[in-house]
From Swiss-Prot:
Tissues and organs where the protein is expressed, per its UniProt entry: Expressed by the venom gland.
Domain-related comment: The presence of a 'disulfide through disulfide knot' structurally defines this protein as a knottin.
Annotated InterPro entries: Huwentoxin-1, Huwentoxin_CS1
Organism of derivation: Cyriopagopus hainanus
Keywords: Disulfide bond, Ion channel impairing toxin, Knottin, Secreted, Signal, Toxin
Name of the protein: U6-theraphotoxin-Hhn1a 1
One Pfam family per UniProt: Toxin_12
Disulfide bonds: C63-C77, C70-C82, C76-C89
């Protein structure tokens, strides 16, 4: 009789542990999906901010302003240089005339 009670408790405990792991798995998947959506939104916002060169054509203003898209430094305004990796105009660390 003692063995039957132990066996029944053991099965009950196994089911509880299995349910706990299943619940943790569901929470982990939900958290990962939520974080993935946040990262996608953040990437979209950054790309929209840094490609906001649509406001004026470079022909109208003569040069590209800070964080404007560029291919070479000569396209950027004074005190700005075309960043090699990101291809936008960044400050070239010079001050004055």
């Amino acid at each position: 009789m003692l063995i039957k009670q132990f066996s029944r408790r053991s099965k009950n405990m196994k089911v509880q542990i299995l349910l706990a792991f299943a619940a943790l798995f569901v929470l982990a998947v939900g958290s990962y999906a939520s974080e993935s959506k946040k990262l996608d939104l953040r990437d979209a916002l950054f790309s929209a901010m840094f490609s906001a060169d649509y406001q004026l054509n470079p022909q109208e203003r003569g040069c590209r302003y800070f964080l404007g898209e560029c291919k070479k430094t000569s396209e950027c305004c004074e005190h700005l240089a075309c960043h090699d990796k990101h291809k936008w105009c960044a400050w070239d660390w010079t001050i004055g005339k």
